[in-house]
Amino acid sequence: MSLGNLMETIKDEVIIAMHEADKFSAGNKSAGTRVRKHMQNIKGIAQNIRTEVQHTKNNM
């Protein structure tokens, strides 16, 4: 996956997480679990970006 695609994926995950966070703030407890899930996905994608950037930098 390209760096741009990974960044778009993070953006999409953040938008979904924000929507779920609004539901959680309104009292929907199960939305909190979904927020945590999306944040974990974002963390993983961010790590992939870091790895890809480091790999590209080392091969320059």
Spans of features found by a protein language model:
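Membrane-interface helix-loop junctions in multi-pass transporters/channels
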Residues: 4, 53-59
